[in-house]
């Protein structure tokens, strides 16, 4: 029931009188995502009390809009052509349209945050979106960096991926008036879930299938992204093999 309401609100809150935003926004939001982040928010909101279902749904919409915006921007940066087995928005409408509609979704998300009127939620999401941007820049800085350490890699995936899961779990606790200790525990769950989620994605990029991932295999390799499979391979291979991987 909550997910059905979420889908309805996503459609309503993404609509404008600008046709390109409607077309491109519908494409990214209805592209077959699993809604993992808003689902975590909804579930964590059930652990407390005094839950306002409208606020829960609106907060879940915010999380999904932020996620969709990052996907639009990521696909432009990575020059990706396929996501969830469909053409990416930048492939269909071009980079400019994808970036601008990503900006719209970010700003619409923060419009809704203002309506929710929770300083704690606002602070959490302001920090989260800023950290995501830092993570994306850190990843860009380390393209083809075969000296990237596992520690640095973990920091990158925390900033660009895990922190939104962390925020989702935390916000559910805030909405349902959980104790500070409970909210911290929820945030830790979101953190670890997000790390595991990204580790799995990075593994499947090499050892999965297109039917599982919805995108072409070894995209990370072709984009020069150094992920954990490459880091471990570099640790175990000889100098000749390292040179080959570096190329």
Model-derived regions, located:
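N-terminal amphipathic/basic leader segments beginning at the initiator methionine
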Residues: 1-11
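Mg2+-dependent prenyl diphosphate-binding active-site environment of isoprenoid biosynthetic enzymes
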Residues: 11-242
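A mobile "lid/hinge" subdomain adjacent to the ATP/sugar-phosphate binding pocket shared
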Residues: 243-247
